[in-house]
Regions:
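Iron-sulfur cluster-binding electron-transfer modules in prokaryotic oxidoreductases
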Residues: 1-245
Length: 245
């Protein structure tokens, strides 16, 4: 199978190490990975801000760029969910959106498609798992606590393959961190308070690191923690899965 690697714009600009780790991890599993150099944003910021026509053009270009691949894999539950759920509506007129059926977050792809039974990675640290809203409620990376369904967590399942790691989950484990894209801009006080509450619960686990599938959530909490000098660090889950490669 041929995999097209989609690196979201904020990962490319602010956390390129996450993109590199994703590529290294997929290659270490003997997968055929290609990174299209002329890729751009998926259009989520524009759509969320109300500029739907601008997002429409970007979505159409995205679909054309990644059309040739069997899977499109991204280290971002948020962006993967946007392409999967909203691109078909954006490009519906006279065009069938194909990438929406192919795109997967890297956690989802590894857990559901590749299904590794072992990894070469090592991460001898205590880690608290952050379940992002998009990951839980749009991609099904873990079971939402408000539903009476069997409990599962694909992030935790993959982290258990890492040598030396200790995995924790905070109280109210799938409550929002307060980022929410434009929400953090339009409601900064509420967003910050939600982030503070989430960080407090992660610290209460005794963890050294907070990890999750969305750099945007981690960035939000990291900014608050740094400003308030909180004793905890942040790392994308794919960096842990690729640690030592």
């Amino acid at each position: 199978m041929k995999i097209g690697l989609f690196i979201p714009c904020y990962v490319d600009a602010l956390y390129p190490e996450v993109g590199v780790a994703t590529y290294k991890l997929l290659k270490s599993l003997a997968l055929d990975v290609d990174y299209p150099l002329n890729q751009t944003c998926c259009g989520q910021p524009m759509a969320n801000a109300g500029f739907e026509k601008m997002a429409d053009n970007i979505a159409s270009r995205f679909d054309q760029l990644f059309d040739a691949y069997d899977y499109v894999v991204a280290p971002s539950a948020s962006c993967a969910a946007f392409v999967k759920l909203y691109h078909p509506r954006l490009v519906k007129e006279g065009h069938q959106c194909l990438t929406s059926k192919k795109i997967m977050d890297v956690v989802e792809f590894l857990h559901d498609v590749v299904k590794p039974t072992s990894l070469k990675s090592k991460f001898p640290h205590i880690v608290s798992v952050h379940n992002s809203c998009h990951g839980v409620r749009e991609l099904g990376l873990s079971s939402p606590s408000e539903r009476n369904v069997p409990q599962f967590n694909k992030i935790v399942d993959l982290l258990r393959l890492v040598d030396g790691i200790t995995i924790c989950q905070p109280e109210r484990k799938d409550e929002c961190c307060g980022f929410g894209g434009m929400f953090s801009v339009e409601e900064p006080d509420v967003s910050t308070r939600m982030g503070e509450d989430k960080i407090t619960r992660h610290i209460a686990t005794g963890a050294e690191y907070v990890t999750g599938p969305d750099s945007s959530c981690l960035m939000h909490m990291q900014g608050i923690a740094k400003r308030e000098k909180k004793p905890i660090k942040f790392i994308h889950v794919v960096q842990i899965l690729a640690a030592g490669l």
